[in-house]
Design a protein with these regions (language model features):
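Non-catalytic, conformational "gating/processing" segments within enzyme and secreted inhibitor domains
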Residues: 66, 109-270, 275-277
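Detector for small/aliphatic-rich hydrophobic stretches
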Residues: 3-7, 16-164
Length: 279
């Protein structure tokens, strides 16, 4: 398992949608439901949030020349959490430190993950949240039954040894196609000779705004680029009372979905040219 850890290739998907084209009960109003957290679970949750911002900052350093990028820190923490169940020694210590999980047992971490994966989809009938995990390992690197059972039980992960030939490429792509509702039909076209394992997480979120934007209110507005340039872009607008925070370094506004249990927080660095218009 240690060799696998050193050669793991990690894929994460975060698919977002704010439209209503699903059947079933999606879009049905439901009372707000908040996840009850024990003291330990609350502490772990705080560390997951800390890791999310740390992870974003590190990725932003390497992607700073790109116009846009999208990451899912939750996906990364789930994949690393699965690996943590098979790590020991210095590898385990360093992973715990990176994730902020020092002082917590694997059992406490696993129970937190299991609870969140079970409870998050229940929060709001006007949102859909699905999460899928899988671990694919090359034949010749047998996995301990306890490791497989743990990740199946707490992460609901599909774990298997594979020949890592074209048939494995097809299996992985088929899994991705299924778990992303056909939005990502293919993620790899070959497997490198030195690849030993693939850890894949797919998170899908679909939500309806609590206060929906009217298409008729969208207007072209001036947008100031970080480079100093100016462009005109279609800009959604509405007048609502929402949670808002600002200081010298950042402005943050929270836009709730459905019953308010989930929300999207937008942040922006304030400039002398343009600030979020708050009334």
């Amino acid at each position: 398992m240690k060799t696998t850890l050193l050669s793991a290739i990690l894929f994460t998907f975060c698919l977002l949608s704010c439209t209503n084209d699903d059947g079933g009960d999606f879009g049905k109003d439901t009372p707000r439901y908040d996840i009850p957290l024990s003291t330990k679970s609350g502490e772990i949750n705080t560390q997951v949030q800390r890791f999310s911002f740390d992870f974003y900052r590190e990725i932003a350093k390497t992607e700073k020349d790109k116009e846009n990028f999208c990451i899912s820190p939750l996906s990364a923490s789930l994949c690393l959490g699965m690996i943590l169940n098979g790590a020991d020694g210095n590898t385990y210590t360093e992973m715990q430190k990176t994730l902020g999980f020092e002082g917590f047992t694997n059992q406490q971490i696993n129970e937190y993950v299991q609870m969140m994966q079970t409870e998050l989809p229940k929060l709001d009938g006007r949102t859909i949240f699905t999460n899928a995990n899988s671990l694919w390992v090359r034949n010749g690197f047998p996995l301990l039954p306890e490791f497989i059972q743990t990740n199946q039980t707490y992460y609901n992960a599909e774990v298997s040894n594979e020949p890592f030939d074209n048939s494995t490429v097809e299996k992985i792509n088929s899994w991705c196609n299924q778990k992303t509702n056909g939005l990502i039909p293919e993620i790899i076209n070959n497997i490198p000779d030195k690849a030993v394992s693939y850890l894949i997480n797919a998170i899908y979120f679909k939500g309806l705004w609590k206060n929906e934007f009217k298409e008729s209110d969208t207007k072209d507005e001036t947008f100031y680029l970080a480079s100093g340039g100016i462009v005109r872009v279609p800009t959604m607008r509405q007048t609502q009372s929402n949670n808002y925070y600002a200081d010298e370094d950042v402005q943050v506004i929270e836009l709730p979905y459905g019953n308010g249990a989930l929300a999207w927080s937008f942040s922006s660095q304030p400039t002398v040219r343009k600030k979020i218009s708050i009334k």
